[in-house]
């Protein structure tokens, strides 16, 4: 039942992303880094999980946000916004609850955008064969998903209740490259540097769950699939990348 509920959550988020895309003509960016950083001194950038709030029955919360200032849980014009608990962002199999106690008590999200196969750090690439759907200021169109919307992973799930896994937060990113609160996760790695599998040990992994045998992912077309722990790692890597042109092996 918990896995079924998780699938439903992911489908609703994928639908919200599609509705955002219909309204704005682009997929929401992984996070938005403004040109003027005067009010963003800590690198607290609003992310895709915030931008889709109006499409998940959270218009009132969205309307409280001053996007000209960063998010901070304890100070500033947006004080407290990031601590809002959103049940639809959390997998019921993660016993941590709706607040991410490993991420400064911000509102938890088990559902992360697919960043790509490179490490997440302060140099955020915008063109690469390792690129995923959600990067800095990305704003992709479906036509940019060269490998096909039914073949490309858009969202994964990451738990926070065991090991070094810290789940995520729905609001955005912070202090990139230094153990940030984060709304994105990474795939298995490049061809020469495989660091993750499904339920792999890397803390940045996109896909780790308490569901027996694997984890759920949502693809760009809105469908949800269950990827097993034994998935071909090359296939998983190709599913993360939006434009590598590779045929996904069995």
Where do the protein language model's features map onto the residues?
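Surface-exposed loop/linker segments characteristic of extracytoplasmic
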Residues: 2-250
């Amino acid at each position: 039942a918990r896995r079924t509920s998780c699938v439903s959550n992911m489908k609703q988020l994928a639908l919200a992303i599609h509705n955002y895309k219909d309204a704005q003509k682009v997929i929401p960016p992984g996070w938005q880094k403004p040109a003027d950083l005067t009010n963003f001194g800590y690198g607290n950038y609003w992310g895709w999980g915030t931008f889709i709030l109006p499409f998940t029955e959270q218009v009132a919360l969205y309307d409280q946000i001053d996007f000209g200032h960063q998010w901070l849980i304890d100070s500033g014009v947006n004080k407290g916004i990031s601590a809002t608990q959103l049940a639809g962002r959390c997998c019921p199999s993660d016993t941590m609850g709706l607040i991410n106690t490993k991420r400064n008590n911000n509102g938890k999200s088990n559902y992360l955008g697919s960043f790509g196969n490179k490490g997440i750090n302060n140099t955020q690439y915008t063109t690469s064969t390792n690129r995923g759907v959600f990067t800095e200021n990305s704003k992709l169109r479906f036509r940019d998903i060269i490998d096909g919307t039914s073949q490309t992973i858009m969202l994964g799930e990451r738990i926070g209740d065991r090991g070094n896994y810290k789940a995520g937060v729905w609001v955005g990113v912070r202090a990139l490259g230094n153990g940030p609160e984060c709304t994105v996760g990474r795939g298995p790695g490049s061809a020469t540097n495989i660091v993750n599998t499904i339920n792999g040990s890397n803390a940045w992994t996109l896909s780790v769950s308490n569901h027996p045998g694997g984890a759920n992912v949502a693809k760009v077309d809105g469908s949800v699939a269950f990827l097993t722990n034994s998935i071909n790692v090359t296939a998983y890597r190709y599913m993360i990348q939006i434009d590598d042109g590779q045929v996904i092996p069995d």
